[in-house]
Regions:
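Beta-rich ligand-binding surfaces for carbohydrates and other polyanions
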Residues: 2-379
Length: 379
């Protein structure tokens, strides 16, 4: 009887330990600095830590599962801990559920999968990856022998650039879609830095070459890269010679963590991530005001550069919500309704390419994504 009692006690102890182990696994603490091949987990494993599973050494940045408007869907992000500002997104709009896994497999490939497919991957299988590290700069790196960086998030930016991050020709920033489902892009292209709207025919709406707020340090040089240094956005040639400098803030602190953010509205904002929760953008932005973006106002409404307001042209002010009734054919030119003092000209797109453009018109207001109709305001 005593022997049976002893074994019963052992069994109960083992069961208790097993249950304790299950409880601990469901509340796994975030890793600090690095993880190693053979790692995997879902949002559920770190639900008690807001989805955070990897922190940089000094807890400046975190790699975590993040849910937006839909509490049941997640993206994999790098977030600045103090400001709660997302600075990098792995899977964009390809959302995963709370049971879908992030995997850093034994072959050195890191990927995020949902129930049916892989939605994001570093494509580093068999390249000799020995660890994944999140640095205090916000850079997520896959490291091989002799500390060689085999992959890094800084080389695959999404909508934000950070202090010390080099942005080179061939890279791209991509905004989230706007309310009218328009996406904006930032690139170094044709010896310039440009912003353009993602219509079927891309529309450039800003370039650094034409922005008179920059300081020219060296003329007639080719722009190859850009990076944030203190309170300036610097642009270099291929030899790292400073060509242009764009000072975006009077606040000069070499230790500040600055972010260049491409917003859904198509503007570029500058934020010191150490100041405020959430951090406030600097007053200076690109373009200088919202009227310089592709769709600052609703269709048929004109943005006034004078007071930066959306205004209905007087010729359309009698129409509800400034929306005229149009009988739009499938192709060709549509005549202006009534006698319009501002002379509005509607041009219908045919196969995504405008049939005719009045070059004397001063501004263009696209009517929705991949515009079916473009309204040219001719004053």
């Amino acid at each position: 009887m005593e022997t049976n009692g002893f074994f019963n006690c052992i069994i109960k102890s083992l069961c208790f330990c097993a249950l304790l182990g299950l409880d601990l696994s469901s509340a796994t603490s975030p890793y600090i600095g690095k993880i190693y091949p053979g790692f995997e987990g879902s949002q559920m494993n770190w639900v008690d830590h807001n989805g955070v599973f990897l922190l940089s050494n000094n807890s400046v940045f975190a790699l975590r599962f993040y849910n937006g408007l839909d509490v049941a869907s997640f993206v994999l992000v790098i977030i600045h801990v103090r400001s709660s500002k997302i600075v990098w997104i792995a899977n964009g709009t390809l959302l995963v559920r709370n049971t879908d896994k992030f995997v850093f497999d034994k072959n050195g490939n890191a990927y995020l999968e949902n129930a049916t497919t892989v939605v994001w991957s570093t494509d580093t299988e068999g390249k000799g990856v020995t660890s994944m590290e999140l640095l205090d700069t916000g850079n997520l790196v896959l490291v091989g022998d002799n500390r060689k960086i085999l992959w890094q998030s800084f080389s695959h930016p999404t909508g934000t650039l950070l202090s010390g991050q080099e942005f080179v020709e061939g890279m791209m920033l991509k905004s989230f879609p706007s309310q009218r489902n328009l996406t904006h892009y930032l690139e170094i292209k044709s010896n310039d830095v440009i912003l353009y709207a993602g219509y079927r025919t891309p529309q450039v709406y800003w370039s650094m070459a034409n922005d008179n707020r920059k300081t020219i340090k060296k003329s007639n040089e080719t722009i190859f890269s850009a990076s944030i240094v203190a309170n300036s956005w610097n642009f270099y040639d291929q030899n790292k010679t400073l060509v242009w400098q764009f000072r975006f803030s009077p606040f000069n602190d070499v230790n500040a963590t600055w972010a260049v953010v491409l917003t859904a509205e198509g503007s570029v904002s500058f934020m010191n991530l150490e100041r405020g929760v959430p951090p406030r953008p600097e007053p200076l932005k690109i373009p200088q005001n919202s009227c310089g973006t592709p769709e600052p106002c609703n269709p048929f409404v004109v943005c006034s550069n004078f007071d930066i307001q959306c205004q209905c042209p007087s010729a359309l002010s009698s129409h509800p919500n400034c929306m005229p009734q149009l009988d739009i054919p499938s192709a060709g030119i549509v005549k202006s309704p009534g006698n319009l003092s501002e002379r509005l000209l509607w041009i219908v797109y045919k196969n995504g390419v405008d049939d005719k453009i009045d070059r004397g018109c001063s501004s263009s207001v696209p009517f929705g994504r991949d515009a079916v109709v473009t309204i040219l305001l001719c004053i």
